[in-house]
Regions:
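Short, conserved loop/helix-junction motifs that constitute active-site signature segments
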Residues: 7, 34-36
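Active-site region of PLP-dependent enzymes
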Residues: 21-29, 37-147
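Active-site core of PLP-dependent enzymes with the aminotransferase class I/II
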Residues: 1-14, 24-27
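Glycine-centered flexible beta-alpha turn that most often forms the glycine-rich phosphate-binding loop
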Residues: 18
């Protein structure tokens, strides 16, 4: 990741880190998703992942402009921020569509399902690590090289 990050700075491209299977993981002592070497990190909450919300995912970034753009896109490109509007706000209830966007908002029920599992994420990661250790041992005893 460090080399990819260096190349991105040298050649001017962005890095999106796919951490779909890495919720709760660490790399070089830092939490995966901290965007140390990427502009955005994405996680999946599909049912086969460590944490599930039945569908959906999460994106993290340290870049405020990227975060603002993601917030806008997730909600049909709508804003209530008067500084971004092209005309004067008519009141607190007023909103404006300033960009094309999508409906990428998770339902409250799906979010609650995901949040309820967060207390157990360390245990889930530990259990997966234990299982991986068993596979490593069995493959080693079988004379197979694991890449």
């Amino acid at each position: 990741m460090k080399k990819i990050s260096s190349l991105s700075k040298e050649y001017g491209f962005s890095v999106i880190e796919d951490a779909s299977h890495a919720i709760g993981g660490r790399y070089q002592g830092k939490s995966i998703g901290c965007c140390q070497y990427s502009d955005i990190t994405v996680f999946s909450f599909h049912p086969v992942k460590i944490i599930t919300t039945a569908e959906g995912g999460l994106a993290t970034t340290n870049d405020v402009s990227i975060a603002d753009k993601m917030k806008s896109l997730r909600s049909h490109g709508i804003t209530r921020d008067t500084s971004l509007m092209t005309s004067v706000s008519e009141g607190d209830w007023y909103y404006q569509q300033i960009d094309l966007g999508f409906n990428y908002r998770m339902t409250d029920v799906h979010a609650a399902l995901g949040v309820s599992q967060m207390k157990q994420v360390d245990e889930f990661v530990r259990r997966r690590s234990d299982i991986a250790g068993i596979y490593d041992k069995e493959f080693k005893d079988a004379g197979l090289d694991v890449l």
